[in-house]
Amino acid sequence: MKFSHSLQFNSVPEWSTKYLAYSQLKKLIYSLQKDKLYSNNKHHVVEPHDANDENLPLLADASPDDQFYISKFVAALNQELKKIDKFYISQETGLIANYNELKDDVMELENTNKATQLFNQQQQHQLQSVARNRKSKSQQRQRRFSSVSSTDSNPSLTDMSIDSAPVIHTQVSNTTNNGNSMQNLASASVSLSNSNPVYLSPFTQHRLSLKKRLISIYTQLSELKDFIELNQTGFSKICKKFDKSLNTNLKQNYLNYIKFHSHVFNPATINRIQHHITETILTYASLNKGTRRPSNTFNLDADRINNDENSSGNEEDEDGNRQEVLDFQDAERELSSHLRDHVVWERNTVWKDMMNLERKYQSAKTDNKKFSKLSSSQLRPNANITESMAMSSGGAGIIAPSTDSLTFRELMHLPPKQWLQFIMGQTSLLKFLLITSCFIALLTFNLTPFTQDSLQKNCFAILIYASLLWATETIPLFVTSLMIPLLIVVFPVIKDPITSQPMSPRDSSQFILSTMWSSVIMLLLGGFTLAAALSKYNIAKVLSTHILASAGTNPHFILLTNMFVALFVSMWVSNVAAPVLCYSIVQPLLRTLPRNCSYAKALILGIALASNIGGMSSPIASPQNIFSIGIMDPSPSWAEWFMIALPVCFICVMAIWVLLIITFPPEPNVKILQLHPSRDPFTLKQWFVTLVCIITIVLWCLSNQISGIFGEMGIISIIPIVVFFGTGLLTSDDFNNFMWTIVVLAMGGTTLGKAVSSSGLLSTMAQLIKAQVEHEPIFIIVLIFGLVILVMATFVSHTVAAMIIVPLMSEIGSNLPSGDHSRLLIVIAALLCSSAMGLPTSGFPNVTAISMIDEVGDRYLTVGTFITRGVPASLLSYAAIVTVGYGILKVMGF
């Protein structure tokens, strides 16, 4: 929610330089913040020109160390205030002059209307006297004259659109004292109305002209009012940012100061503008209805539109007041339609921030594909000779277009060498064709030990095909997940549980599609909803800031505190979203660090690695946990998961913290900014969101005890979704911003697991592996498979590794001679998937960390930084899981 964006889109374009220079003041705040951190404040003395007599009250409550920075900032604020005040006075002066001129014209129109009605009454009286003598003829004459007279006396009968009406600049003047002029005006109206019924009388034209001028005045008054409010909001927000950054209390004092030391922000000024706006609406309502207004139209107060308590007993007065209110609302609505739309900025959810970060990262990436480097002259035999000469002349030439513009006919005429260059440049296509060839070979030839059962043979081919596509990311991960149901139905895999015969394509499709939407998916959406609500209403950030504010300024302790905050946030908003939130919290700290500072690297890497560890901490902390819990039977309760995961997470974070301190030695000249908690009290919405989140988490923790009411945890997840989206706290845009690629990825993994289990392939593979390890102790099995899982999860995503390995671990563990240890192996596998963090692509936190850049656009981290710290961190976590985690699981009877 950036005010600079609101200022940009809601300001009047012609006045863009006259608004508060919000961005420049932000830069000044950051400069003063850094100066305060690295300078000896005791040597700063407030100079007389920095603090005049008017500014002294603003410095009264400040400490001597802060007075220098407050005086510098106040001087910049006063300069902006003077600029805004001067511009406003110049605009107000001209606008009020136009307003008064319009006031006189409206009063003149009212006087003209009165004189016209008086003239019509006199004419009617004369016609009535003549009618007594010539009754038949006078009746016809009276009807004709009455028709014309009513048209003139009630201009609303010739109502038409303001925009389509002609603009008449002729002013009707001196009509009150000149009876001949009024007689001529009425006579002209009569004759012209009879000869041309669509002709507008001068009176009506003048009324429409006044309505146009009222629209213009209303628009300018509204823009002037918005100018005041927008700048007032800007001063409030920039002072709040200054107080937050330098730990001062300037905001309230300065806002009170500008009310009495400027014309633009004086309450009387704002009331005057609002009064003029209300009177303009009242006058427009009168002209719009064509009714007669009293001569003091512009002296009426806005309260006139409300019901008068003194006339409550008179029904006619009440009806009249009610009609005036309706007329006022209609006029206000019509006038407001001519205003520009006001853009309101809401705080983003963490999922929207992730989309923006990914979009920024994707737009910054350069196209590394080789075929894009081929010039047009290389691919096209008839390339433009001018382009070839430009490229060969040693000049810059024209950048060659990519092969996206290459036609099929041109491709067919390429020489063999250029054909080869073109084909070799399509790396993704080549990988896809190679993997697809392997898939076809597995389907066609007997290359596997599963040839005796065609269903298992097909399922193994699909498993290898999907695993290779996931591992290489030849196509997007979610696209591979969507391919799985198609392959399962086309190549028979699903076995009827009763007859053990292959299901028909119709039954197979119904079964496999029904497995895609499960309790796992609902639990995932429930976690996304909690993360969206906690981030949109700033709750997670406020709580995290309060924790970090108590960390002091010791670099080592701040690093450890940030890592535990990342762990804590990951528990409730998932480790997919936690890094984005944590990096926004430490942004002020990173801004004050020198360039290429090793502590900045340690801080960013520490948050990423701790977020990976945080993926173990709760059932909703990561997609792999949700997927693993869905396979376990019975599923562990939240309390059981916490008892297993939290001790392991604590040990892993402490070990990684020591690793970062050793590999990133502290720099003596680096000073750490003291973070300050938010001073804003919790609103009712924030308390409501917090209460709903707590209730949801408590119900999840008690899911086994209340399974007779809610069934599975996925049903409980519907509660926050209905509450937050049903009440409007979250919108449909927030729902659209969910990480749907992760949801589809989880669907694909669930579908593949069902297929592998239904075909019997999982049982056959487990029997083959069990024959090799069944005589080994369970601890040795954990060590062996733990390394395999760690390596696989390092090179593919954590979620994909879990979807491939966890079903196999479940089947192997359930058939061991020592007993059913499937739940133990599943939990170990899930924890190890989160502990793989050796590469920038190993997990969502690492991807977020590698995309972090400083203020000049340089990346904080490199691939080498991840490998040299991530691999040892993975091994330390592996050791903690297979020892401490294994021991806790054995004690708990898993």
From Swiss-Prot:
GO cellular component, alphabetical, reads: fungal-type vacuole membrane; plasma membrane; vacuole-mitochondrion membrane contact site
| Flavoprotein as UniProt keyword | no
Q: Name one Pfam family in it.
A: SPX
The record lists the membrane-crossing segments as: 430-450, 474-494, 511-531, 557-577, 602-622, 642-662, 682-702, 706-726, 738-758, 777-797, 799-819, 824-844, 874-894
The organism's superkingdom is given as Eukaryota
Instruction: List the membrane topology term(s).
Output: Multi-pass membrane protein
**Induced by what?**
Expression is constitutive and independent of inorganic phosphate concentration and PHO4 activity.
Keywords of the record: Membrane, Phosphate transport, Phosphoprotein, Transmembrane, Transmembrane helix, Transport, Ubl conjugation, Vacuole
Positions modified as Phosphoserine?
Answer: 295, 311-312
Q: How is it modified after translation?
A: Ubiquitinated by RSP5. RSP5-mediated ubiquitination initiates internalization and degradation by the endocytic pathway.
Biological process terms from the Gene Ontology for this record are:
glycerol-3-phosphate transmembrane transport; phosphate ion transport; polyphosphate metabolic process; regulation of phosphate transmembrane transport; transmembrane transport
Stored InterPro entries: Cit_transptr-like_dom (IPR004680), SPX_dom (IPR004331)
Residue ranges under compositional bias (Basic residues)?
132-144
What's the chief localization of this chain?
A: membrane
Give its localization. Answer: Vacuole membrane
**Polar residues composition bias: residue spans:** 151-160
Alphabetically, the GO molecular function entries are:
glycerol-3-phosphate transmembrane transporter activity; phosphate transmembrane transporter activity
The chain positions of domain SPX read 1-256
**Residue numbers spanned by region Disordered:** 124-160, 293-321
Further remark, if any?
A: Present with 4280 molecules/cell in log phase SD medium.
The family line of this record is: Belongs to the CitM (TC 2.A.11) transporter family.
Protein name as it appears in the record: Low-affinity phosphate transporter PHO91
Organism of derivation: Saccharomyces cerevisiae (strain ATCC 204508 / S288c)
Gene name in the database record: PHO91
